[in-house]
C-alpha cells in the first residue's frame, strides 16, 4: 500500500481492512516492524474476543510509545536538534530490533547507540548484544549498568568493546563511560 501496509483481518471468507500501519503511532509511520507485529496480534486477539472494529481502530490510533503510555519501551524524544529513542532492550533480540529500526529511520547526520547490560547476564548474552548492534551505528557509547550484580565496575562495557572491535568497529567509534 501507499506509505505502509494495511492490517487486515480475515474472518472465515470475510476480508476486513482495519488500518494502515503508518497511521498507528507506535509503529513510527510503519517503520517499527516489531510494533506492526504487536498491533497485528493485539487487533486479532481483540477481534476474536468480540471487540468492535471501531474500538480496535481507536486503540491502535491512540496508543503510542511515550514514556506515559509505555515507559522504557521505544520512548521517542524529539526536543533536541536530534532524535533520541530510549528502549530498555533486555536481550540481544530486543536490542537488535531497535538497531534495525534505527537503520530504517532517516537521520540527518549519524547514528549513535548507548549500551549497557546488567551484571547478571551471561557472557555470551552480553557479547550477543554487542553483535546485535555491530556495524549499524557510527558511534558506540558503552556504560555500566547500575546493577553490577557481582561483576567488576567496567567488566560489561569492556566485554562489549572487545566484541565490537573483533567485529571490525574502530576504536575511534567506541567510547566507554566509566561513571555518569
Residue ranges and their predicted role:
Residues 4-12:
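Short polybasic amphipathic segments
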Residues 10, 89, 114-116, 143, ...:
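Generic beta-strand/beta-sheet core signal
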Residues 13-15, 156:
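Short, flexible, mixed-charge acidic loops at enzyme active sites
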Residues 16-139:
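Nucleotide phosphate-binding/pyrophosphate-handling subdomain across enzymes
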Residues 130-180:
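C-terminal helical cap/extension that packs against the catalytic core
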